[in-house]
Amino acid sequence: MAGPAAHFSDEQFREACAELQKPALTGADWQLLVEASGITIYRLLDQSTGLYEYKVFGVLESCIPSLLADVYMDLDYRKKWDQYVKELYEKSFDGQMVAYWEVKYPFPLSNRDYVYTRQRRDLDVDGRKIYVVLAQNISVPQFPEKSGVIRVKQYKQSLAIESDGKKGSRVFMYYFDNPGGQIPSWLINWAAKNGVPSFLKDMVKACQNYHKKT
């Protein structure tokens, strides 16, 4: 049986790096959604789904890039600090790591789950150390859909991190997520507007409490 295909090209990693230096917001109808606590979020309507793509820019103080990247990649640790995680783990299929992630949704909505692959690269770009993580949904028979949980079949995320020149990190994040089902648009917008800054704050706190396992 063929394994899940690799999704990430060198160009995708370069594009994420480039956004840190010069955000690519021209040539499309990117709208400013929110600007607060050092975090700026833009959104772009995806015509095919009626949902939005998001770009997030900001500085996370008191968390150095290498630590932030380690915390982001550590799924076991995320189960301790992310209150919305119900289940999260990785398995290897034909030499490629595949992650399973179930997210708690508020009643009466059904939980969502994701099956995705991800890759981290620590890059040197013109003397700048940049940590990039790319993630995208895939379909593998080893993770069939569960009864009562809605499978997210469109999910894509990019994260790029570099030093802010002090003791913090400059961050770029792109994500698109089609949660499926009948979720009111106001709730999706609220989650993007409030959930992302809240997640980043939680991640900074997680960095401060993180002790890398040896």
From Swiss-Prot:
Gene3D superfamilies: 3.30.530.20. The modification N-acetylmethionine is found at residue 1. Transmembrane segments: none annotated. The modification Phosphoserine is found at residue 139. It holds the Pfam family START. GO terms for molecular function: phosphatidylcholine binding; phosphatidylcholine transporter activity. Keywords: Acetylation, Cytoplasm, Lipid transport, Lipid-binding, Phosphoprotein, Transport. GO terms for biological process: cholesterol metabolic process; negative regulation of cold-induced thermogenesis; phospholipid transport. It is found in: Cytoplasm. Interacts with ACOT13/THEM2. PANTHER family: PHOSPHATIDYLCHOLINE TRANSFER PROTEIN. This is Phosphatidylcholine transfer protein.
